[in-house]
């Protein structure tokens, strides 16, 4: 049986934020938790399904993989959520809803936030790949206070509310729930004399330069993950990740559709009529394109393997050239006379032979009006 869409399971939209995801999961967890539905297999299944969906969507990197590749992108990464459905209410409230007082649930450390950066590339760069340097805003440990957040000569003090534990217990009905301390916001410490350089944060802003290796074949919407290059963690927590989102600029000649490239090639009325040969551009250089006689405007010519090689491997696409027969402009009097003479040679008994589409079109129009009886 195919898995349901995780967003559908939680009943949220695909652009839901972290709070909406938590709120939706809390509602389902309270409704279907095994502690409240003993011996109810259907409720247990729904609880596990909701827990699995929450585990993926609450993790930014797993969510990004799921958004791009669906269930195939996260197979094996979902553990069923909170130990496969065996977690207690206290675990759920501590892990998911511990921010009621503005802090984390059980951990004293906080993972750094993920960052996103839009990288604009030319089509040639996206197709061939390259290494680019980007500058992103970030943080580093404050040197003035060595990351403590306290002014030199002072230090953080143990929080009197939680006695340095960073957590307090509160009663909710029949359950005792462990929450982040509202006084110290889960840190276990109080800074009475904050550092003037970092305002008690223990870190200051610093721009950093990173090298991003862009693989060949990327397209608009593709994302490159740089693990550990996001915001620094709080209180020794791990850093977040940086997601580089690719945006390919419009090209003056080519348009892209997956692996294939398209371009328009103008040809003269003479080349279209008599045939000829011309050079067309590709991303690998110029190639010869043979135009057969009696070519009509809009005809597509396919150049095999002159498109884009997929970023995840596989054969290259094709380049499709659509010819546009140009009508001559700015003609001299003599040129117009020659065209009129040429037109006279096409008229007469053999006129339909030289313009079959035109003849069939006029016949179709005539039949249309005859049927409508105008």
Curated annotation (Swiss-Prot):
GO terms for molecular function: ATP binding; heat shock protein binding; unfolded protein binding; zinc ion binding. Zn(2+) 2 binds at residues 159, 162, 181, 184. Zn(2+) 1 binds at residues 142, 145, 195, 198. One of its GO terms (cellular component) is cytoplasm. Its cofactor is Zn(2+). GO terms for biological process: chaperone cofactor-dependent protein refolding; DNA replication; protein refolding; response to heat. Residues 5-70 form the J domain. Binds 2 Zn(2+) ions per monomer. Belongs to the DnaJ family. The J domain is necessary and sufficient to stimulate DnaK ATPase activity. Zinc center 1 plays an important role in the autonomous, DnaK-independent chaperone activity of DnaJ. Zinc center 2 is essential for interaction with DnaK and for DnaJ activity. Homodimer. This is Chaperone protein DnaJ. It comes from Marinobacter nauticus (strain ATCC 700491 / DSM 11845 / VT8).
């Amino acid at each position: 049986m195919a898995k349901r869409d995780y967003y559908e399971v939680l009943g949220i939209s695909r652009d839901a934020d972290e709070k909406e995801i938590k709120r939706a999961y809390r509602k389902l967890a309270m409704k279907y938790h095994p502690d409240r539905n003993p011996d109810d297999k259907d409720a247990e299944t729904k609880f596990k399904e909701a827990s699995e969906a929450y585990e993926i969507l609450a993790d930014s990197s797993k969510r990004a993989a799921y958004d791009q590749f669906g269930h195939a992108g996260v197979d094996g990464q979902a553990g069923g959520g909170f130990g496969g459905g065996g977690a207690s209410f206290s675990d759920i409230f501590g892990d998911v809803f511990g921010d009621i007082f503005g802090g984390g649930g059980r951990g004293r450390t906080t993972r750094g936030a993920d960052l996103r950066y839009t990288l604009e590339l030319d089509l040639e760069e996206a197709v061939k790949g390259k290494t680019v340097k980007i500058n992103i805003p970030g943080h580093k440990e404050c040197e003035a206070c060595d990351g403590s957040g306290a002014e030199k000569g002072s230090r953080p003090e143990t929080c009197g509310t939680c006695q340095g534990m960073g957590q307090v217990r509160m009663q909710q009905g029949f359950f005792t729930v462990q929450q982040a301390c509202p006084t110290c916001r889960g840190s276990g410490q109080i800074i009475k004399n904050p550092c003037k350089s970092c305002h008690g944060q223990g870190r200051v802003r610093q721009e950093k330069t990173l090298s991003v290796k862009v693989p060949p074949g990327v397209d608009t919407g593709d994302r490159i993950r740089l693990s550990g290059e996001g915001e620094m963690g709080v209180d020794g927590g791990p850093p977040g990740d940086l997601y580089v989102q690719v945006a390919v600029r419009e090209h003056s000649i080519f348009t892209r559709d997956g692996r294939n490239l398209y371009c328009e090639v103008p040809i003269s009325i003479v080349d279209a009529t008599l045939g000829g040969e011309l050079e067309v551009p590709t991303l690998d250089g110029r190639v010869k394109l043979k135009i057969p006689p009696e070519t009509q405007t809009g005809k597509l010519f396919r150049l095999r393997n002159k498109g884009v090689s997929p970023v995840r491997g596989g054969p290259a696409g094709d380049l499709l050239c659509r010819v546009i027969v140009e009508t001559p402009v700015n003609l001299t009097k003599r040129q117009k006379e020659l065209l009129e003479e040429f037109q006279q040679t096409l008229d007469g008994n053999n006129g339909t032979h030289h313009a079959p589409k035109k003849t069939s079109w006029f016949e179709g129009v005539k039949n249309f009006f005859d049927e409508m009886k105008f």
